[in-house]
A protein has these predicted regions:
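Generic secondary-structure boundary/loop-capping signal
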Residues: 51, 107-109, 115, 199, ...
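Conserved NTP/Mg2+-binding pocket subregion across the NTase superfamily
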Residues: 55-170, 269
Length: 277
């Protein structure tokens, strides 16, 4: 904080992220997400003298200085700093128009306010991170995409295309599965608890049986195990989707489920040299 207090160009500093969340579990690896409001960006743009001020750097990343994705150069610069002592600081500098978006985050704690411009910010809370109930359209789209991609996975296994299979299953199919898991979690918690980034807090509220089945969807590279994980994925998705549909009065697309499930089982039983389906 002395760095910010002694720099007249820095007008305010806030803390975001898990350290601003009273409900987040505390541990030794929590990052410090710090954002600084500045009047002039030029002193903080690609400045190699800034990171060493906070400790001995193990590895440094500057997102706005990376080739991909291309930087927008829009009045924002970030230093992601992992220190050798185990601490990490994500330090950003923002011009006023971009700092507005930073302080709109419900997880915001004021650390410094030289001009009294942040006095109306409410106490930090995780309300922005609560799951939201699905619309029927979102629900139907999720079901459709899950079963659509599941067929891709099955065809990829038959073709012996490991990298394609793992990507389709662990990125696209899992994305839809986790949407459904979060909606189910929301129902169980009345949509008043946050599932955490990537669902990291789901385990504490899911039935142990469901969590055990979810673990089984993470397979190794052996195709027999990938098949099994795909079937378990389908079982969990179907079970939770029917619960979600029942809770909100939606119609579960059973016909799509049946069509794709039967197709997947048929592919599994196809000989490797099959000339027709």
């Amino acid at each position: 904080m002395n760095y910010a207090r002694n720099d007249d160009n820095i007008r305010a500093v806030v803390l975001n992220g898990s350290r601003a969340n009273l409900n987040a579990p505390k541990d030794i690896f929590q990052d410090y997400d710090i954002a600084c409001l500045v009047n002039d960006m030029s002193p903080y743009f690609k400045n190699p003298n800034i990171p060493p001020l906070f400790g001995e750097i193990m590895i440094l990343q500057e997102p706005e200085d990376m080739q991909e994705p291309p930087a927008e150069n829009d009045g924002h610069y970030t230093y992601l700093m992992q220190f050798k002592d185990g601490n990490r600081i994500d330090l950003s500098f923002d011009l006023p128009e971009l700092f507005k978006a930073v302080i709109e985050d419900s997880l915001t704690v004021i650390l410094l306010d030289k001009d009294g411009i942040l006095k109306d910010i409410p106490p930090s809370s995780d309300k922005d991170y609560m799951p939201k109930p699905p619309t029927e359209k979102l629900f139907q789209d999720c079901c459709n995409e899950f079963w659509w991609v599941s067929a891709y996975v099955a065809k990829g296994i038959w073709r012996n295309e490991l990298t394609f299979v793992k990507h389709m299953q662990d990125v696209y199919a899992r994305e839809q599965l986790m949407k459904m898991v979060v909606w189910y979690f929301g129902i169980k918690t009345d949509f008043k608890e946050a599932p955490g980034k990537m669902g990291k807090y789901l385990k504490k509220q899911l039935d142990p049986e469901i969590w055990t089945e979810l673990e089984k969807t993470y397979s190794d590279a052996k195709f027999e195990n990938v098949w099994e994980s795909l079937f378990v994925m389908g079982d969990i998705f179907r079970r939770l989707a029917k619960d979600v549909a029942s809770n909100f009065g939606f119609q579960y697309p059973q016909q799509e489920d049946d069509n794709v499930s039967n197709f997947i089982y048929k592919i599994k039983n196809l000989p490797a040299d099959a000339k027709e389906i």
